[in-house]
């Protein structure tokens, strides 16, 4: 039986601001990426998100991003590899404290937004992220963009397991990278098209690029975004589509 992980970015609320549909999405995913306070989230939200994930038996990962609350971590920052190492180490450590306090165990690390996209094409940034993971806990998995040589090489260098990720509702360029969110066609807004893309990736191992060419994608985890208007409905659709097609949903081991 084909097996796939469904992951979602959660814990993005902070202070008086509520983001996402965390409670309603948790039953339909197998792993979550928890914002660690730099691009979103706050200490109370981190604790609450960890506790809810454990109640649903969902694998927990840190979702470190750039210190850019106003830009939601989606703007590139011109910082050194050393600074990125510090940012990532700090955020992993913060979430790990909440996970341990709740009696759980962190499974993975997935960079957020601009940090993720920059790491996918910049070996120096990917190396800094992998090094931070290695120094805090080398058994943590690294979620990174499928086919990214930067992520692959960094994981190999530090002997970290890379879980190759694809996106349900994002379009792809010919080189296998994601279309920038600054472009109008970055998101797939039609549910049927997104479902078709996910099944192609999981069952057939490819995705159609924005240019119409087939791009090989060997995904081990699929990302759902939890902050969209129809996020919960979409999560249910993918979950049930996988069940109907005999695809087992579970976190990576």
Curated annotation (Swiss-Prot):
Catalyzes the cleavage of 5-oxoproline to form L-glutamate coupled to the hydrolysis of ATP to ADP and inorganic phosphate. This is 5-oxoprolinase subunit A. GO terms for biological process: carbohydrate metabolic process. CDD domains: LamB_YcsF_like. It comes from Bacillus thuringiensis subsp. konkukian (strain 97-27). Forms a complex composed of PxpA, PxpB and PxpC. It is an enzyme of class 3 (hydrolase). The keyword Nucleotide-binding applies. Keywords: ATP-binding, Hydrolase, Nucleotide-binding. Its EC number is 3.5.2.9. Belongs to the LamB/PxpA family. One of its GO terms (molecular function) is 5-oxoprolinase (ATP-hydrolyzing) activity. It catalyses: 5-oxo-L-proline + ATP + 2 H2O = L-glutamate + ADP + phosphate + H(+).
């Amino acid at each position: 039986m084909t097996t796939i992980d469904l992951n979602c970015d959660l814990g993005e609320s902070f202070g008086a601001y509520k983001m996402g549909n965390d409670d309603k999405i948790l039953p339909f995913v197998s792993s979550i990426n928890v914002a660690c306070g730099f691009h979103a989230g706050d200490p109370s939200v981190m604790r609450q998100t960890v506790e809810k994930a454990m109640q649903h038996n969902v694998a927990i990962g840190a979702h470190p991003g750039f210190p850019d609350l106003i830009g939601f971590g989606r703007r590139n920052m011109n910082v050194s590899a050393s600074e990125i190492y510090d940012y990532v180490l700090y955020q992993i450590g913060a979430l790990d404290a909440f996970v341990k306090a709740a009696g759980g165990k962190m499974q993975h690390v997935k960079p957020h937004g601009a940090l993720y996209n920059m790491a996918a094409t910049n070996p120096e940034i990917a190396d800094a992220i992998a090094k931070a993971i290695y120094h805090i806990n080398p058994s943590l998995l690294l979620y990174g963009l499928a086919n990214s040589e930067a992520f692959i090489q960094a994981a190999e260098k530090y002997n970290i397991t890379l879980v190759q990720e694809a996106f349900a509702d994002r379009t792809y360029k010919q080189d296998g990278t994601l279309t920038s969110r600054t472009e109008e066609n970055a998101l797939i807004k039609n549910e049927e098209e997104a479902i078709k893309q996910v099944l192609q990736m999981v069952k057939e191992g490819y995705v159609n690029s924005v240019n119409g060419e087939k791009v090989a994608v060997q995904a081990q985890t699929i990302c759902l975004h939890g902050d969209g208007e129809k996020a919960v409905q979409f999560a249910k659709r993918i979950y049930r589509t996988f069940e109907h097609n005999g695809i087992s949903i579970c976190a990576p081991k």
